[in-house]
Structures are given as structure tokens and as C-alpha cells.
Amino acid sequence: MWSYRIVAPYLFERTSIPDNTVEHLADGQVLLQFSAAGVCGSDLPAFRGNRGRLPGDDGKSAAEKDGFPIHEVAGEVIASRHPDHRAGDRVVGWASRFDGLMERVISDGNMLAPYHPALSPAEAVGLQPLACVLYACEQLPDLSGLHVAIIGQGSIGLLFSYVAKAAGARRVTGVDPVDRSGQAPAFGVDDPVRATSDRWVSQLAPGDRADVVIEAVGHQVATLGHAIEAAAPGATVFYFGVADDEAYPINMRLMLRNNLTLKSGVTLDRRRVLGLAAKFADEHPELLRTYLTHTFGVDDVQGAFDLACRPDPERIKIAIGA
């Protein structure tokens, strides 16, 4: 079967490896025929050659791990050892081993859920990041009537903007150095700010500080501090971005004096929140169509990741389709 792996910084190689088959499935696992994958911002450090912490990320120049780093997948069930999945089901969710960039993917069935047949696989793969956003928003206060600021307006940050506005946020501020003014109305952003977060927070008036600040950048330590500085007294800061460092410096005095709450965490209860994402998408039928801006074939994985690494105001979600 076909598979891809990163063999050097910024370089994918297509290979042929032995097929995954039903004999390889453990209890609770599902074998998928690849239909589509989504490129996530958290995939990009691996593409750049950074060494991660997953088993098998041990190549000399890059990970050299089959199928890595894709975790957002849609596919058709070939075989199942999970009670809720059957051959022929079309499902979306997580490639639980972060090896979704191959023709046949083995994943934990508890991280997959069916999607509406009206959606193309490339559109459906957007349900996975939407599920993550909905789960994170469950951890926040009721957003009705609040000012919500999101640092980072990439594919995940724009979803946070959309969900916050749909939840009744009074004002949504989106901060990104890439110009997102063209996408702001469709994603519920009242105040699109084209600036780095340090510049934005340095010029904030007290009345413009937010009731909820969501960090949706990750992979460095600075933006968490900016989120804390941008929070109004009594506010909640949610750190969603992936933490590549073990220790993050924060202004604890500011946390204390402003009575702030800092939260973070990965997505749990994944089948349930995939179901919530499907319901949300049904109620907002324009969302996934607007969200998906670029689709590449499996013969151009390199092109998909090259685009993902370039600042582009027209790019939101990139999918790779079979």
C-alpha cells in the first residue's frame, strides 16, 4: 500500500509498505481505507524536521515514520474489531497512532464516528478539529454576552471564533499577523486584528481586555504570556496550542492580582464530541464548505504541506483526498 514519511526537513517521500490487514487489529481497533486527511498546524513542526516525543520518531534527518504526522482522517471501514463500527461505514476522527498518511489506516474505534453522506470526505475531515474546539469550549464559562479574544486565526483559531460567536459572545476579537479581514465576517470575528500578539496586547486599553482569551498558536512560550496580559480581571485563559516545551513562564503576580483562571487540556470523550461536531455542522451548513479552502490529491502531499507552511490570507483548511 502507499504511504508517506518525512525523510528530511520539509521533504516527504512516497513509499510502498506491506498492507495493514484485519489480522493486525487489536480489540477495539478499526481498519480504514483512506479517503481524506486534514493538515493540522500541529503537524508542521514534524514537517520542519523537529523531533517529537512519539515512539518511532527517531530518524536521522526527520521522523522517517510511516504515515506520520497526520492524525485528522476520514475513511471507509474495511474491517472492525469495535462493536460500533461495521465494514462499509464512512467515519471521521483521529488516526490514533498519528500515522494517517497511508492507504490503510489502523485506529482506535473510540476515536472515530460516522459522518453525514452529504459531506465529501475532504469536508468531513473538518469535523475532527471542530470536535476539539467544541470540547475546549465545554471547559469555558458560558460565552453569552462575553468578549472573547482568540490569539491565532489559523484553521483552529477561526473555528474558535465561529463557535464563540455561535455561543452568543458579545464581541469576538481575532489576532493574527496574517490578514484575516476577508474571512472575519464568515467566522464571526467582530474585530480582526492584523498584528503579532505582543504588539496587540501592548496597546490594549483596559476596556478592551477580554473576558475569555484563547491561545490557539502553540509551539512556543511567548503567546501564553500575551494571553494572560490580555485578560480582564476575573477572566479565563484557555491554552489550546500544543506545548512543545515542558516549562512555560507566566506572570503569576498578574494571575493573582487579576483573579484569573488558566485552563488547558487535550480532547477527551472523542466519539461523543465528534457527534456534537456533526450536529453543529448540520445546524451551520455553510461552515465546513467555507472552512475547506484547498484540497490536494494524495500524489501531492508535498504541495499540501508546502502551502500549510506559507502565510496565505486565502488559506484556511487544507485537505488531502484520495
Predicted regions and their residues:
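Short amphipathic alpha-helix with an adjacent loop that forms part of the alpha/beta core around
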Residues: 198-208
